[in-house]
Amino acid sequence: MSKVKIFWQETCPNCPQAKELGKKLAASGVAVEYHNIRDSAGLTEAVMHGVMTTPSVVIVADDDSEKAVWRGSTPKFDEVKATLASAPA
């Protein structure tokens, strides 16, 4: 099953919107991970996905391959749900 990874940092003015999207997705049953790029684990994960800016939202399959990416922006809830529905697990 696909999951959503949200990359954020404290100084990012648009990251609260991305984190709110994550809360809505989680409430609808989507697996969501949050990665603060200012800590070592979050930075490592960001490097693996080529994240250079925040917020970034990445949909990944079980094997961690990317299915969709929004870098430097927060997609709409419906857009993410539609992408998840059409993305193979």
Model feature map: region roles:
Residues G22, G29-V32, P75-D78:
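Non-catalytic interaction surface on structured domains
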Residues T44-H49, V80-L84:
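Short amphipathic alpha-helix with an adjacent loop that forms part of the alpha/beta core around
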Residues I59-A89:
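Non-catalytic, surface beta->alpha helical segment in thiol-disulfide oxidoreductase systems
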Residues P13, A41, P75:
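Short alpha-helical
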Residues K19-E20, G42-E45:
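A generic local structural motif
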Residues M1-S28:
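Local sequence-structure signature of Cys/Sec-based thiol-disulfide redox active-site neighborhoods
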Residues V30-L43:
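Thiol-based oxidoreductase modules, predominantly thioredoxin-like and allied folds used
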Residues H49-I59:
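Structural micro-motif
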